[in-house]
Design a protein with these regions (language model features):
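Extended, low-polarity segments enriched in aliphatic/aromatic residues
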Residues: 1-189
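Iron-sulfur cluster-binding cysteine motifs and their immediate structural context
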Residues: 198-216, 221, 232-245
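Small/polar glycine-rich anion-binding or flexible loop at a beta-alpha turn
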Residues: 122-130, 216-221, 226
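C-terminal accessory/binding modules appended to enzymatic or scaffolding proteins
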Residues: 174-215
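Short pre-active-site segment immediately N-terminal to redox-active cysteine/selenocysteine motifs
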Residues: 191-192, 225-226, 236
Length: 245
């Protein structure tokens, strides 16, 4: 972390309401990864490649930096292929809290995503950073206190494009994980790719999981045996040519 950050009297975290290929959403908790600078960001993805391990690292990071206030801009949010290549969608909300887990859980509910399905919410509550439980959250608006149901009815968007897939922790999913099958994978839409190489540069894996294996006259190619599913390539692509399936 930059020493200047740790020398400040107060830190305020300003996040954008967006989807995320690895963590489902990126909001208050995930925003703190922006405090990590330079190539340390890429190193973090190789050290914590899974959604759960990455989420736990983010919880520790938030405890270390300890922002006094978390503000989330949801006036225009991003849905779909986030966090860098999604589509803008108006949510018309500005949220703030001293509890980043509660803030992200409200975001989750507004887009009809179960908050406990978001790794940063689940581990954030387990590790004592905050709470996603509705009965422990108070919602205040300029017009006074409202219930979660009232907030969802007034500000929610059930059509918001976010991954709501249920993950079943049984023997078949564990076997699939071990065999590297049935996992989300990034892929390149050749007609959109301009072969700029930013995806190759952003890949944190030693030896590169995506590279110009057929020469720079054609789009980069993935080696899924190396890919750790950090989706840095998808996040950094300036042409929205990388999707996750």
């Amino acid at each position: 972390l930059p020493k200047e950050l740790l020398e400040q009297d107060c830190v305020i975290s300003l996040s954008k309401m967006k989807t995320h290929a690895l963590e489902r959403i990126t909001g208050a908790v995930k925003n703190s990864y922006g405090f990590v600078y330079g190539f340390h960001k890429a190193k973090g993805h190789t050290q914590y490649p899974s959604a759960d391990s990455f989420a736990r690292m983010l919880i520790d990071l938030n405890k270390c930096v300890a922002p006094k206030l978390y503000v989330m801009d949801g006036i225009v949010a991003m849905e779909g292929n986030g966090p860098g290549s999604g589509d803008p969608v108006p949510m018309n909300v500005l949220l703030m809290s001293t509890d980043p887990v509660a803030l992200d859980s409200v975001f989750s509910r507004l887009v009809y995503l179960k908050p406990e399905m978001v790794p940063t919410n689940y581990h954030g509550e387990k590790m004592g950073l905050g709470t996603w439980k509705e009965e422990e959250i108070t919602l205040l608006t300029p017009d006074g206190e409202i219930s979660m149901a009232e907030a969802v009815k007034k500000y929610g968007n059930p059509a918001f494009n976010v991954d709501r897939t249920e993950v079943r922790k049984n023997i078949w999913t564990r076997m699939a994980g071990a065999l590297n099958i049935f996992q989300k994978k990034p892929y390149i839409e050749a007609d959109k790719c301009v072969r700029c190489g930013i995806c190759v540069q952003s890949c944190p894996v030693p030896g590169k999981a995506v590279d110009f294996r057929k020469g720079k006259g054609k789009p980069p190619v993935y080696d899924y045996r190396k890919c750790i599913r950090c989706f840095c390539c998808q996040e950094m692509c300036p042409k929205k040519a990388i999707k996750v399936k």
